[in-house]
Amino acid sequence: MPHSRQPSISSSIMSQSNHNHPQKIGPWKLGKTLGRGATGRVLLATHQTTGQKAAVKVVSKSELQDEETEKNGDGLPYGIEREIIIMKLLTHPNVLRLYDVWETSKALYLVLEYVEGGELFDLLVERGPLPEVEAIKYFRQIILGTAYCHALGICHRDLKPENLLLDSQLNVKLADFGMAALESNGKLLETSCGSPHYAAPEIVSGLKYHGAASDVWSCGVILFALLTGRLPFDDENIRNLLLKVQAGNFEMPVDEVSREARDLIARMLEVDPMRRISTEKILRHPLLTKYPMSNEDLISEKSLPHPQTGYKSLGSVRNIDKQILSNLTILWNDRPEEEIVDCLLKDGSNPEKTFYALLMRYKHNQEDNTNNNSPKKSTSFNNKVVRSGSKYSLNGTPRRKRASHISVSRPTSFQYKSNPGAGATANRNSVARHSVASSANNSPRKSPYKSPYRSPYRSPYKSPSKRYSYNQSPTKSPYGRRSNSQRQFENEPLKAKPRNIYNEIVDAQSNFSLPPSLPPSLPSKDSRYMIDEPNQPQLQQPALSQVPENPIVDESPDLMQSAKISSGKRNSIIGKNNNNSNSNKRMSKRKSIRASMTTGLKRNSITMKLLSTYAKLSGDDDWEYMDKQTKRTSATFAALCDKIFNQEDYDEEDEQLVDPEEKEAKEYERLMELERKKHEAELKARRELEKKKRRQKRRSILSSKKLSIIVKNDADPNNSEQELVDEGIKQPKRQSKNLTALRALSEGNHASEELTLEDVENLKRRSASQPVPKRRQTPVLTRRPVSRLDPLWQAHENEQLDRAKDALEQEWRDSQKRSSTVSRKKVNRESMISVMDDIVEEDQGRVNRRSTRNTYYERERDYELPEPTVEDSNLTDDYMTEIRKSRLLNSQLNVRDPLNEKRKSEPKTLISNVQIPSVTRKSRNFTTSNKRLSVLSMYSTKESYRDLNSIINSPDENPEQHQNMNKPALRTSIADRLDKAGLAEPEYETETDGEDKVSVIDLDDHLADRRTSYYDGSGKRASRASTTKRYNVHSSSGQRPKSKVPDLPKNDYDDTFVSNSDEVHKRQYKSMVSDESSASDDVFDKIKLPDGKSTKSSIDELANGTSTSGHRKPKIRHSQPGPEMLIPHLNGGIESSQPMSKVRGNNSSGHDDSVPPPPPAHKVNKKPLDDKTNFPPPEVDPKRKGSFFRKLSWGSKKTIENNTNAATNTTTQQQLPSPAESKEEKPKSSFFRWFSSSNTPSAAEIRKFNTILPKHEMSTALFALLNSWSNFGLKDLRNDQVGYYITGAISKHNSFNLKSCKFRIKINQRDFNQKSEIVCVRVKGSKVTTDTLFSEIEKVLLKEGVLDK
């Protein structure tokens, strides 16, 4: 039968999704989660008796059961149990101990040794490369633990620093045998498991491999990491990493490590597993012999099993220990003995040989310990055997398997490699070992390692305290007290047992296993009941006749051991009184005499006691699960564990273990009793309360009569309430006592009921609003007015009215907020206006809801967090960036509360009336007296180039030149447009001098190019392409400053479409379209322009702090902002980068350069262009600031740019032609191209505006304007560049609570296309909405100065 790879607890992948673990597992109380791994969660557990800590690994059984269905060989439990026994039998100072194993219906709980030192990985991370001497100390212990496992045919297969734990003394413990495998019958392992950085090439390649060799590779990687602080194979890409491992390619650290270390690493990281060094040779390598070894490590090495222990054949059947063979038979579920013998005689590794070696080593260790301890009181081995987890009591009464744990302990020594038997005290924990005279030494509670691994069949209440106590007290070892006579039979051959002896054994066993006072389903074990009732065993004897005959009885060699059941020893360990112990000793003595007359009984035999009893039960596996309690997994496994790893002594709790159903019934009765008492207490409390109320009512009536100031009917309830409060203080002592008792019984219910009347009154008064402060001291406020004659009536009535009014107002506000903000959020998530509106409205709602309490604090908050003042302040680029960021994103609290107050006080206005703050931005081109364009113009500035001349001269021929151009970039709704244009978002860098920046216009240009490329002529596309190219090349060079600001009201026109309801925006951002104070009217008058020229583009440059030369103060700018700025700006993109020697006021005829005209005549001595557009417009737009048409003007700028390219390549300054003159060139990258879209118009109402821009420029600019409003609800925009009309719609989910509508705008030419006419028509929908939209458009055109008056 193939047993090579049974379903493995550890190899199964557990997913313990639910956290419904029992609060305790046996004696272990589960605590916090220590971590999670591939095999499940690890919990910290504390022993309830000793306080010992352990780590409990929770393993889900669902995967195990799946594996069981796949493996029909041995069935699930046996494979798991074999692995558990292996882990229990692995007793080595450098291997983490397994103490107990418990199971519920859903999970297995592996109780492991808890080490406080953490992982070796953490040590490496914290300290980096270790000194060689320290690294070798850890490495030697890793190899010792690994060699120990390999000698027994066990491979870890997942060695890595994370699985190497350190105890408090910084000794290494191999942990997490989750991938561990038994090499079976010399077969190679096939599972590719482990961690990629530490996995061997053969595992990575998916080849069959020897587990031992793969562990050596992992140890080599660990050695490399210990010495260098890094891994030999590492790569971010897992595939590349695996390829490196497969090829064995790594860089040997020459300078960092010694020659010996390099040699060992090279031999361990050998790709060919056949040539890889073995653990035995590693221990003899010069690197390890170079440094002295600690005594513990020396002892550990000397006590290692022979490397071939798990591999070599046992030679002949004569060499096979019959007792161990019988153990193996039971472990493999009564597998034929011949098959097991065949496996033991084969060469090579197999599980049978591994178990044989482990058990033999265990047996020798027991004998060594026995010889080292003087015999104490005779204690029977079988008194432990009776505590097996068999399902049936020995008298034939079926029992549930009790919750218990695997108390399999680990052998201390095997056949020692050098000196068999010498290593009994060899390991670090040898103190414990030699103090134990028998296998009890290895039982979990007696385990020197305090191994929490216990047999799943053991009682849940076994105390691991013995794990400690045995370390100090050898006398507590059951085997330490064993008589020499018990040992004399150990080596006798197995003999058949007569039936009468078997009956006697079962008789004695059952007497102790089932005291009559306990339910028949109790686990079989001698208990303290036997001490108190020494005659009870005789009561149970008749039941023995019911025990069915067991055909194996006559062949079982060790039955008589069970006849000697000495609870005295156990009781002495548990701490029972000496009298009881003595009586039990006498009983044990009698049984020992009877046993001594039986031939062939070995008292200290390593074989399982009562083998036949368990064999009888081994075929029956219909055991039950108990969710609340844990249990052993199978009868045969219990047999093996009980026999081999002697049962421990039990605590008193152990003896009280009852049937789960009975326990459940008792618990239910207890709860019901509690409920009944509670109910009775509540009834009593209520009755007392009623009596009390009646007494108080009588007193209140009497007192009200005495006072004679109130009407009786009204007075009763109120006075009774008042009296009730007083009475709570002045109660008679008797009453108070009763109430206290009742209150305790009713668990606090009574106390709450005492306040019922008062609470009701308070609730009545507070029903309309939030609670108000209670002033119980004054009777005026503790009662309601009795009648209209009561002096309190007026105050009370006013208070009620105020609260009702507040509640209604709040209700109205909430409904308004819900109706407005929900729809706004639905569509306009990017609109900062709606976002800030929501923020402020929500905050406002909270303030209003708390108005009765927080009014004072609101006022205080206004002073604590005043609205930041930005007007007329000089701010650096960085500071402006931070202001924009914090105002809009990170510091909303700073503006919320002041805004809330302002919002209440400020009148509702259109956005066109909002003041724009004048904020200056410092750069080396600005003095402190120079005002920056408005803050928002920073966002709306479309484009300014520093070296337009070179661009004009070679727009497409020299793209590399564009990389050298530093263009200011201001963030408008750039991210939105980038998304729409499919253009990668540029990198922004904030620069204080503001010089190396790219204008958003490039982006807008790119968008416009995409939108209108179909209609554009090749000339237009060329112009736009050059712009886009400049932009792209430049952005790739990293010149474009990256704005740290989130997308703000991205430009002036982003903010223009603000309705009355958008108060936040008005208060917070002061839209750039709004009128400004006279102080800001002359913004442009104070801007110094470069000597070369002053186009609008140059103004943009100045605004962005990007102009390279000084500026003169313009004097005329404020008189006619619109046309002058537009046209120059249209040309401005071309000129801005050139030295600005000429001002806007010059006649266009006076200049023949390729440079467009500057912005408004900033110098009086220069004449404006002849075109009427160059005359100062009426003071319509005193603030040229956030001019949305700066984008507009860019359209003409582009055209002129092309003009000048075609006309001349000279760099002399020349005034720009008027818009009329440049009309044919302008189609190319008109700024309004941004906003184009179209929808179907219908004649509802017509609005016409005459503008001074040519038709194509106006079309592009207007489309750009509308497009920028898309965040606020405009949608479906279409721009027909052939027919020059724009169609669009306003969504019903707009930011301003306007109704939806559709509109159409047609641009017609005038004056030979030097000017244009805008015709706005409502197609369908709300007339109010279209009127609002057209009015906003008109305001923007007016502000920009492009309306032709």
UniProtKB/Swiss-Prot annotation:
Q: Phosphothreonine occurs at which residues? A: 69, 191, 397, 412, 778, 869, 876, 941, 990, 992, 1056, 1095, 1106
Its PTM note reads: Hyperphosphorylated during mitosis at dozens of sites. Among these, 7 have perfect or minimal CDK consensus sites and are CDC28 targets.
Compositional bias, Low complexity, is annotated for 1-20, 369-384, 443-470, 570-585, 1202-1215
Polar residues bias spans: 406-418, 426-442, 471-488, 1024-1040, 1134-1149
**What EC number(s) would the UniProt record show?**
2.7.11.1
Could you tell me where this protein is found in the cell? Cytoplasm; Bud neck
Catalysed reaction, written as an equation: L-seryl-[protein] + ATP = O-phospho-L-seryl-[protein] + ADP + H(+); L-threonyl-[protein] + ATP = O-phospho-L-threonyl-[protein] + ADP + H(+)
SMART domains, per the entry: S_TKc
Where, per the database record, does this protein carry Phosphoserine? 10-12, 15, 294, 300, 303, 388, 390, 393, 407, 409, 413, 455, 469, 473, 477, 485, 556, 634, 720, 746, 891, 973, 999, 1059, 1074, 1077-1078, 1080, 1094, 1097-1098, 1154, 1218
CDD domains in alphabetical order: Kcc4p_like_C, STKc_BRSK1_2
> In a knockout, what does one observe?
Leads to hyperinvasive cells.
Residues in the active site? 158
* UniProt binding sites for ATP: 34-42, 57
Q: Which GO MF terms are attached to this record?
A: ATP binding; phospholipid binding; protein kinase activity; protein serine kinase activity; protein serine/threonine kinase activity
- State the GO CC annotations: cellular bud neck; cytoplasm; incipient cellular bud site; nucleolus; nucleus; septin ring
**Where is the Protein kinase domain positioned along the sequence?**
28-288
Matching SUPFAM superfamilies:
Protein kinase-like (PK-like)
Positions of region (Disordered): 1-30, 366-498, 510-532, 570-593, 712-737, 756-798, 1011-1229
List the Pfam families: Fungal_KA1, Pkinase
Among InterPro entries, the record links this protein to:
Fungal_KA1_dom, KA1_sf_fungal, Kinase-like_dom_sf, Prot_kinase_dom, Protein_kinase_ATP_BS, Ser/Thr_kinase_AS
| Function of the molecule | Serine/threonine-protein kinase which regulates the localization and the function of the septins during mitosis. Involved in the formation of the septin ring but not the basal septin band. Phosphorylates septins CDC11 and SEP7. Required for the transition from pseudohyphae to hyphae. Acts upstream of IRS4 and INP51 in regulating cell wall integrity responses. Involved in propolis-induced cell death.
State how it assembles: Associates with the septin complex which consists of CDC3, CDC10, CDC11, CDC12, and SEP7.
Q: Which family does it belong to?
A: Belongs to the protein kinase superfamily. CAMK Ser/Thr protein kinase family. NIM1 subfamily.
Q: What is this protein called?
A: Serine/threonine-protein kinase GIN4
Per the UniProt record, the source organism is Candida albicans (strain SC5314 / ATCC MYA-2876) (Yeast)
